[in-house]
From Swiss-Prot:
GO terms for biological process: tRNA processing; tRNA splicing, via endonucleolytic cleavage and ligation. Belongs to the tRNA-intron endonuclease family. Archaeal long subfamily. InterPro entries: tRNA_endonuc-like_dom_sf, tRNA_intron_Endo_cat-like_sf, tRNA_intron_Endonuc_cat-like, tRNA_intron_Endonuc_N, tRNA_intron_Endonuc_N_sf, tRNA_splic, tRNA_splic_arch_long. It comes from Halobacterium salinarum (strain ATCC 700922 / JCM 11081 / NRC-1) (Halobacterium halobium). This is tRNA-splicing endonuclease. The gene is endA. The active site is at residues 277, 288, 319.
Amino acid sequence: MDGDLRGDTVHIGGDARQRFHDARGYGYPLGGNDIAVSLVEAAHLLFRGDLDSVDGMGFRAFLTDREAGFAARFLVYVDLRDRGFYLVPDRDPWWRDPGDGDFVVFPRGNTRRDGVVKHRVRVVDERTTLPVDGLSESVLAVVDEESEITYLDIAPETPTGETTLDRPTDVPGVLLDDRVLVWEPPQRLHNAGFYGQPLGGRAADHDALQLSLVEAAYLIDAGVLRLTDATIDDVRARGRLGEGEHFDCRLAVYRALRDAGAVPKTGFKFGADFRVYSAVSSVDDLGHSELLVRVITDTHVFSPGDLSLDVRLAHGVRKRMVFAATDDTDDTIRWLSVSRLTP
């Protein structure tokens, strides 16, 4: 059986509708028994030996005659078919509600007629740049230089928490280098709110709480903390001295997390900006943090390798990786959760 190349589709006659479309989900009907299939579907049919040729080209010639990026899409298509999924190109007329990805994947045992979507898949290679403003809810299929495929699930995130605290007010503190010290602090500030770290160990002769600059700036804004030797502008300036504008971005994200009832703490040892606990009632009964948050700007550009590295690190410590993209006013934060996926 042969196919005819018509632009970006291949037309197949004979018993193609019953054999390929009705039974196995390829292409769309043209009328009678004829169907049109996409180029990647045609390549798969050639690869399997179901088609003999397209315009006289066998599989090898057809594959090498395609545009840049086709090989990666073909590899992902083959992989998902081999995993037992039906899938179609993410465009009309294959799918009634086309998006900006490459494939619409249906649950095992389902076809497009069932109308249930399992994944929207976008295919990239490992050298593709990925602007954060171009990432949407989808599965990113990254094809590396050895043709292995990594699937990353990208989804919007809404951080929430259940931490409540009767916060004190007008607590005095002093600015010391890149932290703020609170002498004789209200115990609930750390014990129930998990703000700061106590100075010294159990044998310390002085009761003091160390606050990071981000924590201090947030607590000053909230009316909890009052500096006796500096202002909030001094705290911000000290933060910018070491981080530049990233300090303001981190502060905006910290504020959003705290205001949502979550508890962000430094994520330095995990290579992130914050580790986040959804609920803290006492530091003596502290569970594991659930999220790692990396703060970026809304103009950030990922490489697939860096994205995969962050996700693998979070997975290795049993956390989810979340990216918080701030705009130039720090008023709007876009949250994206990225995790590894096995289709």
